[in-house]
């Protein structure tokens, strides 16, 4: 119950809205404060009108589909859309399953991946990992298009376990080799060339003639496995529940140590991780149910000031409360540039590891960028500019 916490009702609701999206306006806060906290959580997880706004003006102002324009679409959606959590979870998966434009230079595949995260990001882990494993941007990013019988490429099989699901120390090199064999033949159709016809997406393609049909041993299981079998085994591992739930806690609740240190640094709140992993096992890895457990918990309600906003969160929150992105306009790319200047180039993370978060968002340069951006849109001078 709210009365058990040393915050007012509006403070608690504001905290929730900052974590599920980028905050809310005073009018929105007054409206949602009329219902119970548990009912608000239910509405956030299953909104009545998730697509109750139009984006047609993006096509009016921006004639092409570059990654910065789609970062702008994401920013507009999370501020104005009817399902901010869907947009927030898409960035969560983008951070965890980091895939960058700089290798492929093919924006449509990155756009397709972001839309895939929006579509499946609140479903279950098996569906999420299967969708990821069939995603052309990921297949190219981690070279699985070169993974064929007789010449296996272990890149995706390794990162699937190390960075995307289980974490370091929970599998063997033989597991990596057999996972790679299970994903042989998983590739994508060649997209239409960039010029002169423009950008076109590609699609998943399974080439049976390039798939290894041998008997395989993987994480204690044996069989003639394919990629889907490997994913089914992975999502039922206790290590996967712990790893994914710690990522969720780190993103929505409290900044943890950087991910490479997780195998030697214990979680800050083991009780919270246990609550989340229990929910993972009970719901077969359903992200919506895990988040329901998280948002309704006492430790979440008491987690104010424990999470340092990412650049995307900071810019989104500033624009939300100042009312500077209530309509689509050409200057939206300036906001995307501000996010990039603070150290987070959306759809173009620096490595497969994604971005280091928490305090590592801050250095001398990025701190100045943060302060200057917030002052630009929230100071008295900003009020004077808006009245001109």
Where are these regions (language model features)?
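A conserved hydrophobic secondary-structure block that centers on an alpha-helix together
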Residues: 100-137
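N-terminal accessory alpha/beta regions
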Residues: 28-110, 116
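Loop/turn elements at helix/coil->beta-strand transitions in domains of secreted/extracellular proteins
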Residues: 86-87, 123-126, 172, 241, ...
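Long, well-ordered, tryptophan-enriched scaffold segments
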Residues: 178-181, 185-226
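Glycine-rich, acidic and aromatic/proline-enriched surface loops and short helix-turn segments
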Residues: 83, 87-102, 134-138, 182-186, ...
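Activity-critical C-terminal alpha-helical subdomain
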Residues: 136-191
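Flexible, low-complexity segments enriched for small/polar residues
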Residues: 3-9, 13-26, 237, 241, ...
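Single conserved hydrophobic/aromatic residue that forms the stacking wall/gate
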Residues: 377-388
């Amino acid at each position: 119950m709210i009365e058990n916490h040393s915050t007012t009702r509006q403070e608690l609701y504001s905290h929730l809205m900052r974590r599920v999206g980028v905050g809310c306006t005073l009018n929105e806060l007054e409206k949602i404060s009329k219902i119970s906290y548990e009912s608000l959580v239910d509405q956030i997880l299953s909104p009545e009108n998730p697509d109750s706004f139009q984006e047609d003006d993006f096509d009016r102002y921006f004639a092409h589909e570059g990654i910065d324009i789609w970062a702008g679409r994401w920013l507009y959606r999370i501020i104005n859309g009817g399902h901010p959590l869907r947009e927030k979870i898409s960035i969560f998966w983008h951070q965890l399953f980091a895939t960058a434009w700089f290798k492929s230079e093919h924006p449509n595949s990155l756009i397709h991946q972001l839309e895939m995260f929006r579509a499946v990001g609140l479903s279950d882990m098996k569906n999420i990992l299967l969708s990821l494993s069939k995603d052309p941007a990921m297949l190219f990013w981690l070279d699985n298009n070169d993974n064929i019988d007789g010449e296996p490429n272990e890149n995706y099989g390794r990162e699937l376990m190390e960075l995307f699901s289980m974490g370091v120390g929970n599998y063997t090199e033989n597991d990596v080799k057999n996972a790679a064999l299970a994903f042989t033949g998983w590739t994508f159709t060649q997209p239409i060339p960039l010029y002169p016809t423009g950008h076109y997406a590609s699609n998943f393609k399974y080439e049976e003639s390039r798939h290894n049909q041998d008997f395989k041993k993987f994480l204690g299981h044996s069989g003639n496995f394919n990629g889907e079998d490997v994913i089914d085994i992975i999502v039922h591992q206790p290590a996967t529940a712990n790893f994914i739930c710690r990522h969720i806690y780190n993103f929505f609740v409290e900044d943890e140590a950087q991910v490479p240190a997780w195998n030697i640094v214990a979680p800050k709140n083991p009780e919270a991780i246990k609550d989340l992993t229990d929910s993972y096992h009970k719901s077969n890895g359903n992200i919506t149910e895990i988040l329901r457990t998280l948002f309704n918990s006492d430790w979440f309600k008491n987690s104010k000031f424990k999470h340092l906003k990412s650049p995307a969160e900071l810019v989104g929150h500033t624009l939300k409360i100042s009312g500077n992105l209530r309509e689509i306009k050409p200057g939206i790319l300036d906001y995307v540039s501000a996010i990039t200047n603070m150290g987070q180039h959306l759809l173009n993370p620096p490595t497969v590891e994604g971005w280091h978060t928490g305090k590592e968002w801050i250095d001398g340069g990025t701190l100045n960028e943060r302060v200057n951006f917030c002052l630009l849109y929230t100071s008295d001078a900003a009020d004077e500019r808006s009245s001109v």
